[in-house]
């Protein structure tokens, strides 16, 4: 274990290749995956995400309402239906909520947004068309980017098929963890996953995938610390 600024690094693979053409990032929600990827985008890498087509698909849905918790404020132009049960909050259509808040804020502030994406992407698409549905689509995009001489970073690796694709294309996958040192050490060295948290399949898989990586960054510092660690690595 080494320490760099506010970022603890658990390195099980000293041979991590800084010149990989494709880098995947795995971690739980809000662990800093997108921030880590942005550090490379700022250096000229191309960002892709397995969930991008899913998000585009979800934005085309109409008539899908999500519960907006009390205290979350939407633009006055967004049509809302007030909760008449006395619990506070309101309901609005998914695409209006995402337009008003932006995708990342919507996922954090309105839990139904994340749940809808998980259900549509995993339970519906993967459940109906198989585990490689999103992988097959992404592989074509990655190969095209690589043929153009681009380096690709993918901050949303959630399934073993996605991990395997990156390895097959000559890439590496690293982990990003936000939490206490003890829980990370338990996971990395003793295969003990923390209790509680999101129980959806896509989140549960993150624990297994973190164990498959050879390199886990403990993101317990500032954004600048995380940027610095990514730039040092790649």
What residues fall within each predicted segment?
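ATP-dependent small-molecule kinase phosphotransfer cores
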Residues: 3, 52-148
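Pre-Walker A (Motif I) flank of P-loop NTPase domains
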Residues: 17-23, 149-150
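ATP-binding Walker
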Residues: 28-31
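Hydrophobic anchor at the beta1->P-loop junction of P-loop NTPases
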Residues: 25, 154
């Amino acid at each position: 274990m080494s320490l760099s600024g506010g970022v603890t690094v658990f390195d099980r693979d000293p041979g991590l290749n800084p010149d990989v053409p494709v880098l995947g990032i795995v971690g739980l929600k809000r662990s800093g995956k997108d921030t880590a990827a942005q550090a490379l985008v700022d250096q000229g890498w191309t960002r892709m995400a397995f969930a991008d087509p899913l998000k585009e698909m979800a934005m085309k849905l109409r008539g899908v309402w999500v519960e907006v918790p009390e205290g979350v404020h939407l633009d006055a132009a967004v049509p809302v239906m007030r909760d008449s049960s006395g619990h506070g909050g309101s309901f609005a259509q998914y695409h209006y909520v995402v337009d008003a808040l932006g995708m990342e804020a919507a996922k954090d502030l309105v839990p139904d947004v994340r749940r809808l994406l998980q259900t549509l992407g995993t339970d519906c698409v993967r459940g109906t068309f198989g585990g490689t549905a999103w992988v097959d689509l992404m592989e074509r995009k990655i190969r095209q980017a690589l043929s153009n001489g681009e380096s690709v970073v993918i901050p949303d690796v959630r399934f073993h098929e996605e991990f395997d694709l990156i390895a097959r294309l000559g890439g590496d996958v690293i982990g990003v963890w936000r939490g206490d040192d003890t829980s990370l050490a338990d996971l990395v060295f003793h295969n003990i996953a923390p209790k509680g948290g999101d129980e959806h399949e896509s989140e549960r898989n993150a624990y297994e995938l973190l164990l498959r990586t050879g390199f886990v960054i403990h993101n317990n510092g500032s954004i600048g610390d995380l940027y610095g660690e990514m730039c040092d690595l790649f």
